[in-house]
UniProtKB/Swiss-Prot annotation:
The keyword Heme does not apply. Residues 1-19 form the signal peptide. The lineage of its organism: Eukaryota, Metazoa, Chordata, Craniata, Vertebrata. Belongs to the PLAC1 family. Its main location: secreted. This is Oocyte-secreted protein 4A.
């Protein structure tokens, strides 16, 4: 009796693994979407909407002609989020509770999101010039381009994912005291 039960579960596992091409997983840094094709999962039985859940009891919330779908924020359903240096690993499972059987099937799902890194301003100091003061006459106005030249900020274009981004390379920023010099 135990052997037939084990063989039955192994057969179900094989059928599930073979049918995983019917599973679509999409994710972002804040949500997880899983679509399961409406095909028989076990013994030619097609799952019903109320027999499927994501994680800890989150029901199907998208019903399409060919798919059952789950779309939830990562803070729901007991979805596990593991943050790594370069990305986020998102893990959960689909629980299939067939009404005709005394056991549940668990289909693991996982998704990886690569982090987007922000533009970083890099500062490089100059030797023997850290005490430079900014001086300008009272009432003298300067354009932004002149201010940038004085601060030696040079714009450059970098390409990330084939999209040009404008970033600034800061060569040095003098420590300025807001002092005005009266020209007399």
């Amino acid at each position: 009796m135990k052997i037939s039960c084990v063989l039955g579960k192994l057969l179900m596992l094989f059928e599930l693994i073979h049918g995983l091409q019917d599973l679509s997983i999409t994710c972002s840094e804040s949500w997880l979407q899983v679509k399961l094709r409406r095909t028989p999962l076990l013994n030619d039985l097609q799952p019903l909407q109320n027999e499927l859940s994501l994680g800890i009891g989150c029901p199907v919330n998208m019903v399409e002609v060919d798919f059952f779908g789950f779309l939830y924020l990562l803070t729901f359903c007991g979805i596990r989020v593991s943050e790594h240096g370069v990305g986020i690993l998102i893990e959960s499972l689909i629980v299939y509770e067939p009404t005709n059987f005394d056991f549940n099937l668990h289909i693991p799902v996982s998704c990886y999101v690569q982090r987007r890194f922000p533009i970083i301003l890099v500062m490089r100091g100059r030797e023997n010039d850290s005490r430079r003061e900014c001086r300008r006459s009272v009432g003298q106005h300067r354009s932004l381009s002149h201010e940038l030249e004085d601060l030696e900020i040079r714009p450059r274009v970098s390409y990330v994912n084939s999209v040009p981004l404008l970033s600034y390379l800061i060569v040095s920023l003098p420590k300025c005291k807001n002092k005005a010099v009266h020209s007399g």
